[in-house]
Amino acid sequence: MVKVYAPASSANMSVGFDVLGAAVTPVDGALLGDVVSVEAADSFSLNNLGRFADKLPPEPRENIVYQCWERFCHALGKTIPVAMTLEKNMPIGSGLGSSACSVVAALVAMNEHCGKPLNDTRLLAMMGELEGRISGSVHYDNVAPCFLGGMQLMIEENGIISQQIPGFDEWLWVLAYPGIKVSTAEARAILPAQYRRQDCIAHGRHLAGFIHACYSRQPQLAAALMKDVIAEPYRARLLPGFSQARQAVAEIGALASGISGSGPTLFALCDKPETAQRVADWLSKHYLQNQEGFVHICRLDTAGARVLG
């Protein structure tokens, strides 16, 4: 049996709409992500387990893991009889790359089970395609970091889908999921069809400056440039208490904060453990909406998807 874990990810990172994403892992050692196991069988079967399994589609063919199996078999030109199990530990519509976790874990597990017939580039292209079935458009800012680890910049030129950019070891990512759902499709629909020239220029300056600051090892500058003029001004209205939370975490000492992916998860960057804990405590008390919400203090997950056991 092959068992693969795929970590949560925070896409956009305020400054890089659809072109930046970071894989994250809790500092306490908890696994924040999905697990898919594959073993040989007489015919295909899929079993759903985990905290959020009851949120999955009741029809198996609508489950993205089934679609991953189907697409993988098509790529190999044969039907591969396997028993698959999805441990759905990630909330759906959370802004933490939930669908990407399932897609990445499923495809890596199938590839491992079959002796790695597909290379990473081919796998990543397939992951983006399947993620697009859920979100409505092909984009790699969750699947790339989830699969490859670290902070990934989407390239999509010269046969390169994404490449890793250097992160900062001292950065702690406080992630607060309030327990409500925001669909990626809904969050995209709220965005304008056109942007003002000054916003386009500001976006380019922020993103170019952020990448420069990462490579020139200027963490304070990198954090200061994590500003969103593309999505956050429009999506903030979908997130109860978001504006107040951003102001509060800044006053506590967070270096930057914003919407993780399309929300509703809020991320806050800190460079001191005690600051991160105070931010986490405030968000636990004031940003969570129900019992399904949670807060994790994380670091970059540099490993990406990996075989367990």
Swiss-Prot record:
Residues the record lists as binding ATP: P91, I92, G93, S94, G95, L96, G97, S98, S99, A100, C101
Pfam families: GHMP_kinases_C, GHMP_kinases_N
First-tier enzyme category under EC: transferase
InterPro entries assigned to the protein according to its UniProt record, in alphabetical order: GHMP_kinase_C_dom, GHMP_kinase_C_sf, GHMP_kinase_N_dom, GHMP_knse_ATP-bd_CS, Homoserine_kinase, Ribosomal_Su5_D2-typ_SF, Ribsml_uS5_D2-typ_fold_subgr
Keyword Amino-acid biosynthesis assigned: yes
Subcellular location: Cytoplasm
Record key words, sorted: Amino-acid biosynthesis, ATP-binding, Cytoplasm, Kinase, Nucleotide-binding, Threonine biosynthesis, Transferase
EC number, as in UniProt: 2.7.1.39
Molecular function terms from GO: ATP binding; homoserine kinase activity
Pathway where it operates: Amino-acid biosynthesis; L-threonine biosynthesis; L-threonine from L-aspartate: step 4/5
Presence of the UniProt keyword Plastid in the record: no
Catalytic reaction equation(s): L-homoserine + ATP = O-phospho-L-homoserine + ADP + H(+)
Biological process according to GO: threonine biosynthetic process
GO cellular component: cytoplasm
Family of this protein: Belongs to the GHMP kinase family. Homoserine kinase subfamily.
Function: Catalyzes the ATP-dependent phosphorylation of L-homoserine to L-homoserine phosphate.
Protein name: Homoserine kinase
Species assigned in the record: Salmonella arizonae (strain ATCC BAA-731 / CDC346-86 / RSK2980)
